[in-house]
Amino acid sequence: MNRIKTAVVIGGTSGLGRSIAEALAQAGVQVTVFGRALPESALENIEYQRLNLLTGDFSPVKEEMDADAVIYAAGLGRIAPFEKLTEGELTTLFRTNAEGFAKVLHIFQPRLLEKKDFFFAVIGSIAGLISSPMFAAYGASKAAVTSLCESVNAELAAQDSPNRILNVSPGALKGTRFYGGEDDPEQTRELAEETIRRMLSREKLWIPKYEEIYKGVLERYHADAEKFGVESWNYKMESGRIGEKPRMKIGFLSGTFDLFHIGHLNLLRRAKQYCDYLVVGVHPPGSSHKNKPTFIPLEERMEIIRAIKYVDEVVVTLDEDDEMYDIIPYDFLFVGSDYKGTDRFNRYEAELCPKGVQIIYFPYTQGTSSTQLREALTRK
């Protein structure tokens, strides 16, 4: 491990990524972990930074160009027939599993091309090497990971770089939340340590339990891909592991968004850091929300919000955010900190928090406000 002093783990707050980050830290490596959700407590040698790959902002990752190693462990999926996946799930899945990996790899490609040591590993999946019914989109995203690793490794070899990308392609893993369970680092510790060892050995593909299980799996797949796929479908149907609901984290916030300004944009940007799918409710004319007249028609206000990249869906909202929960069962409710402690949000906390909703209060910041703009427009 003395070949690595600093490392970056993308998706290192849960699952195998968490175990890899902790194994590196315990070996004395200074680790920067990027994740959408941050842990309540930090381990020694680990710095946590919030990052949602879906925002498209990779600037925090670019600040880590001096790292000795990068591990891309972000990923998500759901066992379900392809037609049961939502459009939002498809977007989130490919942007996280494939596009996010490609962009991070591209950021560090100059380091991989250097003659001095640089190490890179990605957590792929056996589903990316075979046909995988019920995992069609997930398998396709991981197939993109496999193809990119193979091609870029060939480019590195052609340019006489000693560095390589390790594609770790496991099957089902215990001790992760992938199938709805809980994180148990003890169950993934050995796999994490072996991943690090093989990365340092500059291996290019590692399939855990290859001899015991996956050698035969791959042989059956290559012998008759369609027959293998049908058998895989039947096995998953019988396993009882079908995911009935999307596993995306949904965020919701509401506002009038009349006279849109930088404060609104910052609110939307910060909200997206927490969730996979951000729904924004826009109050119609006559709403009791703030009881203020609007200058811009509802349809135009909605169109402005819809055009912002952090927003996934725009709806006409009801007066009360808790009423919207019955229509859109969100996981996060976002609002400014000036609402904390009000009768309205005390009621929301009592009603929504027992349902698993997190109410995130963003610190109020001084700057341009709708009130200022409205006063400027009406001033004579």
Language-model features: where?
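N-terminal Rossmann NAD(P)H-binding glycine-rich loop of SDR-like oxidoreductase domains
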Residues: 13, 21
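Nucleotidyltransferase catalytic core that binds NTPs
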Residues: 246-380
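C-terminal helical subdomain
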Residues: 163, 167-168, 179-219
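Active-site helix of classical SDR
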Residues: 105, 141
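Conserved NAD(P)H cofactor-binding loop of Rossmann-fold oxidoreductase domains
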Residues: 73-79
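Residue(s) in the substrate-gating loop at a strand-loop-helix junction
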Residues: 125
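Substrate-binding pocket helix/loop in short-chain dehydrogenase/reductase
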Residues: 81-82, 89-93
